[in-house]
Amino acid sequence: MIELGVNIDHVATLRQARRTWEPDPAWAAMEAHLGGADGITVHLREDRRHIQDEDVRRLRELTQVKLNLEMAATDEMVGIACALRPEMAMLVPEGRHEVTTEGGLDVLAQEGRLKDVVARLADAGIVTSVFIDAELGQVEAAARIGARVCEIHTGPYAHAFHAAGRDPQSAAVVDEIDKVRRAGEAIRALGMRFNAGHALNYYNVQPIARLPEVRELHIGHAIVSRSVFTGLRDAVREMKRLMREAAGVGR
């Protein structure tokens, strides 16, 4: 069955706007779980712009579903991950100038270093995922460094979908879906788990959820935005419904 990992970074973004104690990401994680989330994702950035170290510690203690820690492949972050031992650590590129992650990790350019990072995480019992663009070379490099999961960056697909007026049949959208599909097939052929995420929302999620090889989608901003009007539990529940409808409930 296709799974939903809910990214709650922007609950912390709202809290940090006032440098106060609410809204509480740990409470958000519990609400997401009650809405049907299969996992919780947070990105502990080097600049600590939203999620803080204490948030990750509390989530590790309180979350009853799997915890996915997005992180840069730095010694500091690897040390934090190894100490807290989330179920999964997803290696992502990171730039202080960016509003959000803008592209996939270039695994090809840093295979040696990333292989060492993956080995350190594996020694701590942590599954490593890499966030990559839908490119065969990056998929193959991910397999070589020992990653067990690849998350394909769906930002280009989401931008094409929006530019096409939400028409899933437009040539540009079909082309982007095909890129994601082919990357997913390569991921599975190499024995890794195929996840996807970035800029997915209630309008564009179904064509991606319909791909037969995809196992998990990570979605954050759209769900947190919808929760302002419906509550987080219902926002998660509706996203999960759309995903399962597209994938077929039995998958």
Curated annotation (Swiss-Prot):
Pathway: Cofactor biosynthesis; pyridoxine 5'-phosphate biosynthesis; pyridoxine 5'-phosphate from D-erythrose 4-phosphate: step 5/5
Record-linked Pfam families: PdxJ (PF03740)
Chief location of this protein within or outside the cell: cytoplasm
Listed InterPro entries: Aldolase_TIM, PyrdxlP_synth_PdxJ, Pyridoxine-5'_phos_synth
Residues that coordinate or bind 1-deoxy-D-xylulose 5-phosphate: D9, H10, R45, H50, T100
Keywords: Cytoplasm, Pyridoxine biosynthesis, Transferase
Superkingdom per UniProt: Bacteria
Subunit and interaction comment: Homooctamer; tetramer of dimers.
Biological role stated in the UniProt entry: Catalyzes the complicated ring closure reaction between the two acyclic compounds 1-deoxy-D-xylulose-5-phosphate (DXP) and 3-amino-2-oxopropyl phosphate (1-amino-acetone-3-phosphate or AAP) to form pyridoxine 5'-phosphate (PNP) and inorganic phosphate.
NCBIfam families registered for this protein in UniProt: pdxJ (TIGR00559), PRK05265.1-3 (NF003625), PRK05265.1-5 (NF003627)
Family, similarity comment: Belongs to the PNP synthase family.
The protein's name in its UniProt record: Pyridoxine 5'-phosphate synthase
